[in-house]
From Swiss-Prot:
It comes from the Bacteria. Gene3D superfamilies: 3.30.420.40. Keywords: ATP-binding, Glycerol metabolism, Kinase, Nucleotide-binding, Phosphoprotein, Transferase. This is Glycerol kinase. It is an enzyme of class 2 (transferase).
Amino acid sequence: MAEEKYIMAIDQGTTSSRAIIFDKKGNKIGSSQKEFTQYFPNAGWVEHNANEIWNSVQSVIAGSLIESGVKPTDIAGIGITNQRETTVVWDKATGLPIYNAIVWQSRQTTPIADQLKEDGYSEMIHEKTGLIIDAYFSATKVRWILDHVEGAQERAENGELMFGTIDTWLVWKLTGDTHVTDYSNASRTMLFNIHDLDWDQEILDLLNIPRVMLPKVVSNSEVYGLTKNYHFYGSEVPIAGMAGDQQAALFGQMAFEPGMVKNTYGTGSFIVMNTGEEPQLSKNNLLTTIGYGINGKVYYALEGSIFVAGSAIQWLRDGLKMLQTAAESEAVAKASTGHNEVYVVPAFTGLGAPYWDSQARGAVFGLTRGTTREDFVKATLQAVAYQVRDIIDTMKEDTGIDIPVLKVDGGAANNDFLMQFQADILNTAVQRAHNLETTALGAAFLAGLAVGFWKDLEEIKAFQEEGQQFEPIMAEEEREDLYEGWQQAVAATQQFKRKNK
């Protein structure tokens, strides 16, 4: 009898790395997770040590094999999904990064982005890349590293340095020599022309980024290379699927049809709509991005990015010591007897879509002497839902497509209070994924399809099980009154800006 085969997904996130092993039916049979250090060298800066990320990935590969009892030889393929935009530049000869990885949340490159806007490049960059000019994307991060590491520009021009987002870094480490990225990750660099499906020479010239340091761009489902046997316990396993975390979640939620929308509540919150085979440029500051490329076709998406979602709950736990665990936030919020008069605007690193205000900072409104810890926790959860409404309303306006149901996943989707309030404030049904591992599952599906582990999308669709659905129950007047209060709070937050001295 043939040994059963499995697919491994490596999910390299903002605060931790995970490896999950799935069987033929898409069931999780083993996993491992490891956190790594966040570095905050200055206000608004966020960095990671790329070698610590690589170490954490090696650790979870081992951990998932140990927990599941699966042999390395039984892994048919590996799928990678990753925190997007985070930028690594490393030495081609030694494999050592020349600077910390600059994380997607980091605002240290804002002056470069501001200069591009001032010089009038916003429209050109939006039309070519689908993105708005912002420090969020990789382009300004690469420029910053080349500016701040002595001799880096010259070495990059000489072909001695390599650039990659985290997917690229991990494939390069695992295979020892393959320098690739996929359509979804490339589309988040602000260097990639989403119409021509190639790096854009005009933007590279504008930022003086040498093309020689960029990876080759490939589809989301094909064999990129084999693991070096010494990195995978003697086995050479095909790395066969790759997608940025939000696009992987779109695929894992099986949002294969145009108009389907998913929201992942992670560190940030990311609402993504499949718009089919034609890119749709937003008039309202949403991002046009590539969902995935598979079987010779490319599917585009519209995305709204919220920088702070789950991390606001972590802040309540770690910064303010209001919670022992993140999960406790649900019970604490439900115990609030206030009337929703408190608003928390968690603009810790500025505001994402649709405001794109990097100077805004967090604020709390509506406090009285009677405000309690419970009210504060509830308002923080509600802030996540309000931000999602900002984006869903914008999406409807941009596309003219009604959104009858919002598919949700990610850690905070476990929070019943948040999900019910989300349904209420949107006046839309919210459907929780039965399997909240949609990001890892998406990467596994992409890899499994490439190696013939699964035949086609139809076979995958058969695994879909619906989770709990939350229906809106709030009165229209209350909903609009609460949302108006949120809009006032955001406007007030944007008024209060202090330049970092």
